[in-house]
Amino acid sequence: MLTYMEVHLYFTLPVLALLAFLYKPFFTTKDRFKYIFLCTVAFATASPWDNYIVYHKAWSYCPECVTAVIGYVPLEEYMFFIIMTLITVTFTSLTMRWTLPSFFIRPETPVFQSVCVRYIPIVGFLTIAAKAWASSIPDSHPFYGACILWYVCPVLALLWIGSGEYMLRRWKAVLFSIAVPTIFLCWVDQYAIARGTWDISRRTSTGIMVLPSLPLEEFLFFLLIDTVLVFASCATDRAHAIVHIYITPMNHNKVSTWYMDFFYLCWAFLQTDQALSGETLSDLDATWRILREASASFYTASSVFSFEARQDLGVLYGFCRATDDLADNNDVSVPDRKKQLELVRGFVRQMFDSKHGHPDIDWTQYSGSIPDSFIAAFRSFTRLRDVLEIKAVEELLDGYTFDLEQREVKNEDDLVYYSACVASSVGEMCTRVLMASEPGGNRTMLKWTVERARDMGLALQLTNIARDIVTDSKQLGRSYVPRDWLTSQESALLKAGKARELGDERLRQIALKMVYTADDLNLMASRAIDYLPPSSRCGVRAACNVYTAIGVSLHKANGYPDRAHLTKLERMKVTFRCVYGFRKGHQGVQGDRGKSQAFTVI
């Protein structure tokens, strides 16, 4: 005999524990709200409904198989309401999190199409509910199935109002999120019925079996309840995305309260796609297109962050990518590229002139001088105005100017200056975005954390330069190795694209000097990761350790590889270990450093 508590101990709780482990690195405060809200609603509505069902003897249990009974329902059944909700919502979150919800909000959809898609299913759900209500006569064969339909269909109709079109646009993920938990729970149900833990009355059901020991009504129950939970999860994700895109930029400097957050979510739930600003979403889409085309690795790697952090990091990186492309576009003359960068500087100054309120920028002044997709990225970038500091943005532009003017890196100070411009600035901006996107970061340590982020950016750039000595020489005729590290002949060879003629031993010596400096910087900088919001720590640690592993690869290599890198499998291993906590802290170069020694960064 299988007790109801054993059903939980052997089946539902282990699966829930596995899902919780898999999802833990991605858990955010938004998820906490989703779990609490959906579990509360599920428990509050399912409890009276299930008592009604058991009272009318549609469902029964083995008295010896339960721990206690509250009302007409076993304690374990109340547990099941919560466990089932957690299993389905967690699995749905794991399935859905890899793509931003904003990609499926489309204000350009024709109104007539939206009206049809929105209201025809609602009418269908409510019609089914009304007919089911009329058919739910106690002690009749349709009773149990009809009770399931009138319990579920009005909720489906309500949820369809706020997320119907959204779910149709990502129907594969929705169906998968419904199917897998349904199959698992039906299997558990079938197993328990076959062993007498509970049973379904033949008098109040159709008697149709989907599988042996699995009545049609039980299959219908799990299918429809899982559908409700997936619909609710999607509706919550869509509402959070709308609030983050349209409300959050206006409230960065306001104290958040739970009742205002709930009000905004209700407002967002009721918004049709057409009621939202199409330009805002099209600008975000244009920004992400830039990233998909220019940096598939960032596009993929960003998925380890929360929706909110990923959206804003994407906006930041899209701006960096667009400005970098402007500076590097060899189809445009250097004087014209300098003019474009001056336009960008003017935009940045305008953006930060008025610290609060919507930025008053005349975008027509950039048309014709800057590609439209880049202007869209700039418009999206304005949402970060209250998060970033102008100094870091201007510092990034100084780095582009350094490259455009082909300035020589004369000494270590120049190397640090250039690296700070193009990388420390980005590290600072990323940290400010992460701290603003999610509660839980240590804001009292913000200044120190930002300084360590700048150190980390510097370390990553030094690793980048160390890796690309030959590549930069061949492809750009450029060297970022300090001139005073080289002889006149070595400097000339690097500029002539003949870096290989320095020999493996010399290239390795130069590269490792930067790698060891980066390693020393990493040692302190990596400690600041623990001051970031919890949901961001694993992603940042993974990104940093992937780059650190490149330095380790250079250290271990025999000679100097043309471009040291990690294989896709190696990157996946590093990321998995960092995300799931198998690797923490500094993972740098181990062993004797030989002749190459780190230089001092002031």
Curated annotation (Swiss-Prot):
Source organism of this protein record: Phycomyces blakesleeanus (strain ATCC 8743b / DSM 1359 / FGSC 10004 / NBRC 33097 / NRRL 1555)
Q: Which UniProt keywords apply?
A: Carotenoid biosynthesis, Isomerase, Membrane, Multifunctional enzyme, Transferase, Transmembrane, Transmembrane helix
- Family assignment from sequence similarity: In the N-terminal section; belongs to the lycopene beta-cyclase family.
Database matches in InterPro entries: Isoprenoid_synthase_dom_sf, Lycopene_cyclase_dom, Squ/phyt_synthse, Squalene/phytoene_synthase_CS, Trans_IPPS_bact-type, Trans_IPPS_HH
Query: Does this entry carry the keyword Manganese?
Result: no
Gene name linked to the record: carRA
Reactions catalysed according to its record: all-trans-lycopene = gamma-carotene; gamma-carotene = all-trans-beta-carotene; 2 (2E,6E,10E)-geranylgeranyl diphosphate = 15-cis-phytoene + 2 diphosphate
Q: In which pathway does it act?
A: Carotenoid biosynthesis; beta-carotene biosynthesis; Carotenoid biosynthesis; phytoene biosynthesis; all-trans-phytoene from geranylgeranyl diphosphate: step 1/1
Official protein name in the record: Bifunctional lycopene cyclase/phytoene synthase
For this protein, the record's PANTHER family field holds: BIFUNCTIONAL LYCOPENE CYCLASE/PHYTOENE SYNTHASE
Specify the effect of residue 465 to T: In carA113; reduces the response to chemical activation
- Localization (cell): Membrane
